[in-house]
Amino acid sequence: MIKREFQSTHYFTVLMGLLRDRQGFMEEIRQGVRLPSKIISLLVCSSLFFAVYGAIIGSSHSPLQALSSAFKLPCFYLMTLILCLPTLYFFSILFGSSKSIGQYFAMLLTSVAVISVLEFSLAPVALFFLITAHNYQFFVLLNVGIFALTGFTGVTFLYQGVQFMSAQDNEAAEETRTRILKFWLILYALVGCQLGWTLRPFFGTSGEFVLFRAMEGNFYLSILKAIGELLGFN
């Protein structure tokens, strides 16, 4: 029992180390210091925070949807990272990076962890509007805005982190690696949007609970439709 409590405390200690001293944390990743401990701690903490937020947005429909979203939201972020990691790693290696895939994985997890912390910090706001604003489209758009804000912040951290980690690599190919990173960030966003659409529903609509919906339409048309309904165009 004491050992489990110690492990839980250790996980959050690692996360707080990232939040309080991001530069020092990234320097340790660049040097390959305690990578397994960092990876496990960030995975555990971010999964827990995403699960809490997922449960809140899913509770707009039913307890089953809350449970489903609590599971699917952490899976969404982790699967997006895993799908895009090989592209960033191998292209970077091809153009002079000397870092291991574990270092890239740890650096990407810092971004995911930052996103999870921001969403967790905004969870009371989402819960407040869930209770007081009984409008499905408004709640969806509010959370899309939260996802966009936290995602942009996380991607900014990621861009800075990967640039920092690669600063001592082959300088001749630095400009090329920067272009690859920018391209990869666009790819990461596109994969994330499509995967999120594939794993839906996270919120749930009126009717019976379903784990997954049929593949139809796309994320962007759905957002436009939600805006139109909120403004009374439909």
Regions found by a protein language model. Give the residues of each.
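Sparse recognition of residues in long alpha-helices and their boundaries
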Residues: S37-K38, P124, M215
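Long, intrinsically disordered, low-complexity regulatory segments adjacent to structured domains
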Residues: I180-W184, Y188-N234
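Amphipathic, well-ordered alpha-helical segments in soluble domains
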Residues: L18-D21, A51, P86-T87, G154-F157
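A glycine-rich, hydrophobic loop/mini-helix early in the fold
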Residues: S37-Y104
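Membrane-interface helix-boundary motifs at transmembrane edges
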Residues: R30-P36, L64, Q168-E175
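N-terminal juxtamembrane cytosolic/stromal segments of multi-pass membrane proteins
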Residues: M1-L42, S222-N234
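Juxtamembrane loop-helix boundary motifs flanking transmembrane segments in multi-pass membrane proteins
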Residues: K3, Q7-V14, L18-R22, E27, ...
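Hydrophobic alpha-helical transmembrane segments and adjacent short intramembrane/lumenal linkers
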Residues: F71-C75, L88-G204
